[in-house]
A protein has these predicted regions:
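Residue-level marker of alpha-helix boundaries and capping positions
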Residues: 8, 32, 81, 110-111
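Internal catalytic-core helix/loop-beta-alpha segment
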Residues: 55-96
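Short, ordered loop/turn segments at secondary-structure junctions
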Residues: 33-34, 106-109, 135
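Short gly/pro/ser/thr-enriched loop/turn and capping motifs at secondary-structure boundaries
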Residues: 59-61, 85, 108-113, 138
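Short glycine-/acidic-enriched loop or helix-start segments at secondary-structure transitions
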Residues: 39-41, 87-90, 113, 142
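Short, conserved glycine- and acidic-residue-centered signature motifs
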Residues: 6-10, 79, 83, 87, ...
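A short glycine-rich beta-strand->turn/loop micro-motif centered on a GG-aromatic cluster
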Residues: 77-80, 100-113
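Active-site acidic carboxylates
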Residues: 1-57, 67-71, 100-103, 120, ...
Length: 157
């Protein structure tokens, strides 16, 4: 991940949203691209995932992501790297499979900003929603009266 532009901030945002998802009992599935040659996901992030799909294709759906998804959850939130390669190809496949796909722009990255920007433009044009970690957290909570509001707020702030 060190080759990804702004990788420390991206990892921080990925950890924020996965911690929030865990608090709210939202399933978390990770993917790892060719870990035998590229290495594993950050251990702190991997520990928050209920499962991790190991993949060699850039599109995680080809290596079993769709089969791993809960059947009762048509809305998906995607984060990760690289925006214009793995994340984009996976999101396009999920959109074609009629999932409601949102991309957390502050929790995605590429080696170059230009690639990330054009990957996000392509995803928006294909029907993906572009959101931020904070937007999704508050959307999940719906109200300051949510029983987990203070716990989530501690992560957001």
């Amino acid at each position: 991940m060190p080759v990804i532009e702004d990788h420390e901030s991206i990892l921080k945002q990925c950890l924020r949203i996965t911690n929030i998802a865990r608090i709210l009992d939202i399933p978390i599935i990770g993917t790892e691209q060719s870990p035998q040659s590229l290495g594993n996901n950050a251990e702190a992030l991997k520990a928050l995932c209920q499962m991790t799909v190991i993949k060699d294709h850039f599109d995680a759906c080809i290596d079993g992501l769709i089969e791993a998804l809960p059947k009762d959850r048509p809305q998906l939130i995607l984060t990760g790297c690289e925006t214009h390669i793995c994340l984009m190809q996976t999101a396009l496949h999920l959109l074609a499979a009629h999932y409601d796909v949102s991309i957390l722009v502050d929790a995605t990255g590429s080696r170059a900003t230009l690639n990330k920007d054009y990957g996000l433009q392509n995803l928006r044009a294909a029907g993906a929603k572009l959101l931020t970690v904070e937007m999704v957290a508050y959307e999940w909570l719906k109200s300051s009266k949510h029983p987990k509001f203070k716990e989530v707020l501690a992560i957001i702030k």
